[in-house]
UniProtKB/Swiss-Prot annotation:
Record-given protein name: Large ribosomal subunit protein uL22c
Gene3D superfamilies named among the record's database cross-references: Ribosomal protein L22/L17
Its job: This protein binds specifically to 23S rRNA. The globular domain of the protein is located near the polypeptide exit tunnel on the outside of the subunit, while an extended beta-hairpin is found that lines the wall of the exit tunnel in the center of the 70S ribosome.
Cell compartments where the protein resides: Plastid, Chloroplast
Chief location bin: plastid
Amino acid sequence: MEKKKEVRALAKYVKMSAHKVRRVINQIRGRSYEEALISLEFLPYRACYPLLQLVSSAAANANNNLGLKKDTLLISEAKVDEASVSKRFQPRAQGRAYSIQKDTCHITIKIRERSK
């Protein structure tokens, strides 16, 4: 039994909530590399830009490290995990302060060769 070749790319501490990235990543999971690029270019979400960079990086890793062609690649796994939260304070009226949480996330993309 031949082991499937798989490469991954990670983006850590992306300054965006995991909930917003999951909305986009659910639409590219299981798609081919070209379909994912087209989807990410035309979706109107801010999360598309770091995902586009990450998918391109994973494809470059597959091409350079394993010699796989980009037209045969498939996104086999795509996940988002919550990372640390930075806490800030917003000054308000009468000496009060509201806390603001700045969320970050870790994004993992795994790409493998499409089975024929």
